[in-house]
Amino acid sequence: MTYRIYLVDDDRFLLDLYAVKFKNAGHDVTVFGGGEELLAALRKEGTAAPDAVLLDVIMPGMTGFETLEAMRKESLAAKAKIIFLSNQGQESDIESAKTLAADGYIIKASAIPSEVFAETMRLLEGGAKAQ
């Protein structure tokens, strides 16, 4: 099955790295440099809804948490799996993600791209929420 994956990160190198991983597996990937860019695309009439959004926490402008709050408030991409992909591994950040009903939280520094890909696929294919 082909999934539509949205990647949101201000680090262009990481965006490209993850995009290649998902594209090579046959998935449709769109990258965004920040939360505002993602929200603008989701609000645009006729935009295809993503199956998953991988969202960095710390970005210029809106944080990933603020972005997800706006998405929830406006019912944007309501059926998408939301996975935080961040270097922020503090328990308070993980708790914030849970409060916002994120489906997963991956710490970039301790996960190679193939692990990020595998966890995303697990969640998309009906895996339980990460704890």
Model-assigned labels for residue ranges:
Residues 2-13, 18-22, 53:
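Conserved acidic segment of CheY-like receiver
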Residues 31-52:
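Acidic, metal-coordinating helix/loop segments flanking the phosphotransfer/catalytic sites
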Residues 44-48, 72-79, 100:
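Conserved phosphotransfer cores of two-component systems
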Residues 56, 86:
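Active-site residues of response regulator receiver
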Residues 59-60:
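Receiver (REC) domain active-site loop signature in two-component systems and cognate sites
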Residues 115-129:
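Receiver (REC) domain switch/output surface
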